[in-house]
Amino acid sequence: MSDNSTGTTKSRSNVDDVQAHYDLSDAFFALFQDPTRTYSCAYFERDDMTLHEAQVAKLDLTLGKLGLEPGMTLLDVGCGWGSVMKRAVERYDVNVVGLTLSKNQHAYCQQVLDKVDTNRSHRVLLSDWANFSEPVDRIVTIEAIEHFGFERYDDFFKFAYNAMPADGVMLLHSITGLHVKQVIERGIPLTMEMAKFIRFIVTDIFPGGRLPTIETIEEHVTKAGFTITDIQSLQPHFARTLDLWAEALQAHKDEAIEIQSAEVYERYMKYLTGCAKAFRMGYIDCNQFTLAK
């Protein structure tokens, strides 16, 4: 891992960018999230699933790819509001460590895990992965790598590879983008409207965020020594997730404005509905990469 001044500065920048979005307000996010407080793509195994059911299905889909056994230690990089760790402890009887750069999520996760009836250890650290040096058995990271910056990918995957034993497995869940050439080859229209929307997302919603292509992920994980054993696209599932988030936020419009402001409400509605459209048009995808040592 890089320990030079540039790396340190970038880490601090990541903290600022993450907190700018995720520390907006727990109460605001709760208006459109399901009861698990999962803020990532759901998995609709059946058409009649509720958002809550689909989020639990996504947690099970994710954890089921890791080969977890009782007593193992699972590291969750970018642990959100703790739903993955909670499910892992309850269903797989493992120890969990969560890393987050969000102060609000750090406090919330600890409260969630403290309520779980288990003898396994559970810790949530307000820390960047670059400052974590303990051995773990499995690693999961869901929609976090988009905040890292491409220049940190090699260090991150090297960190993950070295943290696990010889049979280690990592589940990387990431939104992925396309090169302009790929957009053209697939016949997806290049419009000024979408260009402006992408600028809005990286400026007003996820400052500093960058989407990797599938090829970028493949390049960096194999360079670190991993073998990709499976790639699963969740593209239509994310479009539906965003639809349901937007519907829920719209249904709580007055509360959202009271908690934040009309400007924030309108900004988030634009973000949720616009991203759903981007997934349906094929500009972006969401993929789960299963990585084995």
Swiss-Prot record:
<dbReference type="InterPro" id="IPR003333">
    <property type="entry name" value="CMAS"/>
</dbReference>
<dbReference type="InterPro" id="IPR047672">
    <property type="entry name" value="CMAS_actinobact"/>
</dbReference>
<feature type="binding site">
    <location>
        <begin position="39"/>
        <end position="40"/>
    </location>
    <ligand>
        <name>S-adenosyl-L-methionine</name>
    </ligand>
</feature>
<dbReference type="GO" id="GO:0008825">
    <property type="term" value="F:cyclopropane-fatty-acyl-phospholipid synthase activity"/>
</dbReference>
<dbReference type="GO" id="GO:0005886">
    <property type="term" value="C:plasma membrane"/>
</dbReference>
<keyword id="KW-0443">Lipid metabolism</keyword>
<feature type="binding site">
    <location>
        <begin position="78"/>
        <end position="80"/>
    </location>
    <ligand>
        <name>S-adenosyl-L-methionine</name>
    </ligand>
</feature>
<protein>
    <recommendedName>
        <fullName>Methoxy mycolic acid synthase MmaA3</fullName>
        <ecNumber>2.1.1.-</ecNumber>
    </recommendedName>
</protein>
<feature type="binding site">
    <location>
        <begin position="129"/>
        <end position="130"/>
    </location>
    <ligand>
        <name>S-adenosyl-L-methionine</name>
    </ligand>
</feature>
<keyword id="KW-0444">Lipid biosynthesis</keyword>
<keyword id="KW-0489">Methyltransferase</keyword>
<keyword id="KW-0949">S-adenosyl-L-methionine</keyword>
<dbReference type="GO" id="GO:0071768">
    <property type="term" value="P:mycolic acid biosynthetic process"/>
</dbReference>
<dbReference type="GO" id="GO:0008171">
    <property type="term" value="F:O-methyltransferase activity"/>
</dbReference>
<dbReference type="Pfam" id="PF02353">
    <property type="entry name" value="CMAS"/>
</dbReference>
<dbReference type="InterPro" id="IPR050723">
    <property type="entry name" value="CFA/CMAS"/>
</dbReference>
<dbReference type="GO" id="GO:0032259">
    <property type="term" value="P:methylation"/>
</dbReference>
<comment type="similarity">
    <text>Belongs to the CFA/CMAS family.</text>
</comment>
<comment type="function">
    <text>Involved in the biosynthesis of methoxymycolic acid. It catalyzes the O-methylation of the hydroxy group of the hydroxymycolate to form a methyl ether.</text>
</comment>
<feature type="binding site">
    <location>
        <position position="142"/>
    </location>
    <ligand>
        <name>S-adenosyl-L-methionine</name>
    </ligand>
</feature>
<feature type="binding site">
    <location>
        <begin position="100"/>
        <end position="105"/>
    </location>
    <ligand>
        <name>S-adenosyl-L-methionine</name>
    </ligand>
</feature>
<keyword id="KW-0808">Transferase</keyword>
<dbReference type="GO" id="GO:0008610">
    <property type="term" value="P:lipid biosynthetic process"/>
</dbReference>
<comment type="pathway">
    <text>Lipid metabolism; mycolic acid biosynthesis.</text>
</comment>
<feature type="active site">
    <location>
        <position position="275"/>
    </location>
</feature>
<dbReference type="InterPro" id="IPR029063">
    <property type="entry name" value="SAM-dependent_MTases_sf"/>
</dbReference>
